[in-house]
Regions:
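Transmembrane alpha-helices that form the ion-translocation and gating core
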Residues: 123-164, 317-375, 391, 398-406
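Hydrophobic alpha-helical transmembrane segments in multi-pass integral membrane proteins
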Residues: 136-137, 196-197, 246-250, 290-304, ...
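Functional cores that coordinate and move charged inorganic groups
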Residues: 167-264
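Entry/N-cap segments of selected transmembrane alpha helices
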Residues: 108-135, 206-215, 302-328, 351-355, ...
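Transmembrane alpha-helix boundary signature
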Residues: 55-67, 83-86, 100-117, 132-153
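Structural signature of hydrophobic alpha-helical transmembrane segments
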Residues: 86-98, 146-161, 184, 202-218, ...
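Predominantly late transmembrane helices and immediately cytosolic-facing juxtamembrane segments
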Residues: 4-6, 13-37, 53-57, 70, ...
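Hydrophobic core segments of alpha-helical transmembrane domains in multi-pass membrane transport
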Residues: 44-57, 97-103, 133-138, 216-222, ...
Length: 419
């Protein structure tokens, strides 16, 4: 789960082309502009993670650790929230990311590729397989260890920013239809991550805070039903809901999703509040929120690391889940759906490219690290999880790139000319 920042509106209500038409139509220029932004964001994300790794393995490591533990407190009257900087990033900044996810999910379901059942079938099947495969691999590696089983969801997520960054390196060898398919698959992946967080990684609940959070949610959707289009009203209520959800015991990032879903897609006077906010948030998330998250979560000391450390069942479950479970789940589910006639491959793609894409979904990175902090809040497995996620993500990215680097068949004339 990855880390998703998906495409802007590249189709209209009047015409919702499938992957083939999308790959060849004029509105694709908007998608291509976004993909350039997202690919650049993936590069920044990679740079932030690299800097964190360097700092964590240098004489500056104590300063890096002190920065993450820096206490930050906000108090308004009798309400006080005090957390180390690391948790402000994970609970606060990531709520902004999930609000963007909510905006994008709403748009895609109501107007985008997922509004059409035939277009949605293949990415839905691929995403479901891509979540089930890694989970089963992790469960197989850790069966019988009740504590370790809490981490079953860690390898189910895909970091879309990194995956798109790899596709960008391929140039014309990665057809636009393949990128659109990856984006659509990532939407379902993020929906799955949201549901997993809500159902399986919720701490003990505070009834009073939960009631207030519910009131905030009701007020958000009441604004929508009343025709309110000023996004400031939604954001203010969103902050209130975030505080209540944080205090309730449910993970606070879910407040971001709910806020995004509540903002109107269209207004009566022709404006598009959700679309406008989505466009405004894109650069902040791609070049701010996600790189900051990577910087604060990817730093892991490698001193004393031995091969035996990677053979612990938790690391094996995460690593094999991302490396093996992801590709088998995505590829297997897509192959079955194509064989039984449920869906067809995106136009201009072949099975080798689909397999390369399946490998790229094994880039868990930011979302896998994020779910890891929820599954194991204590520091007992912190370093082990980070090492497994980082190593598996790098191998998945490398293998996916090599497979897609030489698409042997099924290239379109445009691709052959471009090469």
């Amino acid at each position: 789960m990855t880390a998703l920042v998906i495409a802007r509106s590249y189709a209209t209500k009047q015409s919702r082309p499938g992957f083939a038409a999308t790959a060849q139509s004029k509105p694709l220029s908007l998608l291509q502009q976004f993909l350039k932004l997202e690919s650049a964001g993936g590069i920044v994300l990679c740079a932030a993670a690299t800097i964190a790794l360097v700092l964590a393995n240098s004489p500056l490591e104590p300063l890096y650790a002190q920065l993450l533990e820096l206490p930050v407190a906000i108090q308004v009257g009798g309400l006080a929230i005090a957390k180390p900087l690391l948790l402000w990033v994970n609970d606060g900044l990531m709520a902004v990311f999930f609000m963007l996810v909510g905006l994008e999910v709403k748009r895609e379901i109501m107007e985008g590729e997922l509004s059409n059942a035939s277009n949605a079938a293949l990415p839905v099947v691929g995403a479901l397989g891509g979540m089930a495969g890694p989970a089963l691999v992790f469960l197989a590696c850790n069966w019988g260890d009740e504590e370790a089983l809490r981490g079953w969801a860690i390898p189910t997520a895909t970091d879309i920013a990194f995956a798109l960054g790899v596709l960008a390196l391929l140039g014309p060898r990665a057809p636009p239809s393949l990128k659109v398919f990856l984006l659509a698959l990532a939407i379902i992946d993020d929906l799955g991550a949201i549901i997993i967080i809500a159902l399986f990684y919720t701490a003990e609940l505070s009834p009073a805070a939960l009631v207030l959070a519910g009131l905030g949610v009701i007020m958000l959707f009441a604004l929508n039903l009343s025709g309110v289009t000023r996004r400031g009203a939604y954001l203010l209520l969103g902050v209130f809901t975030w505080v209540c959800v944080l205090k309730s015991g449910i993970h606070a990032t879910l407040a971001g999703v709910i806020t995004g879903l509540a903002i109107p897609l269209r207004a009566t006077h022709g404006s598009a509040p959700a679309h406008d906010l989505e466009q405004d948030l894109h650069p902040w998330v791609a070049f701010g929120v996600l790189p900051v998250f990577a910087f604060t979560n990817a730093g892991v000391g490698l001193a004393g690391l031995a091969a035996s450390h990677l053979l612990h069942p938790i690391q094996l479950g995460i690593g094999l889940g991302l490396l093996v479970g992801k590709q088998l789940g995505v590829m297997g589910s897509i192959w079955v759906s194509a064989r039984i006639g449920l869906a067809a491959l995106p136009e201009g793609t072949n099975w080798r490219q689909i397999y390369g894409l399946a490998l790229l979904t094994g880039i868990g990175f930011t979302m896998s690290l994020f779910i890891g902090t929820l599954a194991f809040p204590a520091e007992a497995y912190d370093i082990d999880i980070r090492i497994a996620v980082l190593l598996a993500s790098v191998i998945s990215a490398t293998c996916g790139y090599l497979v897609l680097r030489h698409p042997r068949q099924g290239r379109s004339p445009a691709q052959r000319i471009a090469e």
